[in-house]
């Protein structure tokens, strides 16, 4: 019976001393006794939930279903797995398989037990296998050259579906981006006053004309005039919460006159009036 107890505990009176920070299952549901008496009572019982996971099995081992599988060949060991077999010091932050299911032990014991269990379950380091059909056959004769595969030409319909609005012709009605597009649209930052599809179409056409000046000279396309956000001949109503360029430099008149002066006159006209 003494061999069934956890290593490091007294077989005659097994218990945890107060200050033990490990996990003791069922302790939170027990009361009325001291910490040592309660843990001793739980540990002296039959191997169950009170025992650490290393000395009990909650579920039977799960076996994979037997199915006809192709013959497999072992792959060579990858160099990255050698770090798990080396002596790891406390503070190692890498991943150790199955280490999160072991408690009440120091780092070295947890890692050693986790690696041993993982190696046994997977049949050693050479357990990595590859199906036979997935591995290329190396019995091809050297004189026999593989025939070049004929590349299938993509259909015109597929090319049209995969075409980007950047490369479409200016007359293509699909040369625009849908609302919500977060990519970069050249020249779009200088346009406003319309929906995003219309703005993106105008921006792409303008960018295409700037990129190919010879084409724009042969077939010039005049873009429509941009609509203005502010009226130039009328002032704005009081309590307008938007930004009015040049308004903060105006003073001495009503809000309507000041906004009219700021928006309706050019910089040269303002300098002449002063």
From Swiss-Prot:
Annotated localization: Cytoplasm, Cytoskeleton, Cilium axoneme; Cytoplasm, Cytoskeleton, Flagellum axoneme
Cellular component terms (Gene Ontology): axonemal microtubule; motile cilium
Region Disordered: start-end pairs: 46-89, 119-171
UniProt xrefs under InterPro entries: CMI2A-C-like_dom
UniProt keyword Ion transport, yes or no: no
UniProt superkingdom: Eukaryota
Signal peptide interval: none
Biased composition (Basic and acidic residues): 130-155
UniProt tissue specificity: Expressed in trachea multiciliated cells.
Pfam families: CMI2B-like (PF10629)
Cystine bridges: none
Swiss-Prot/TrEMBL keywords: Cell projection, Cilium, Cytoplasm, Cytoskeleton, Flagellum
Keyword Transcription included in the entry's annotation: no
Function: Microtubule inner protein (MIP) part of the dynein-decorated doublet microtubules (DMTs) in cilia axoneme, which is required for motile cilia beating.
Subunit structure: Microtubule inner protein component of sperm flagellar doublet microtubules.
Family named by the database record: Belongs to the CIMIP2 family.
Protein's name according to its UniProt entry: Ciliary microtubule inner protein 2B
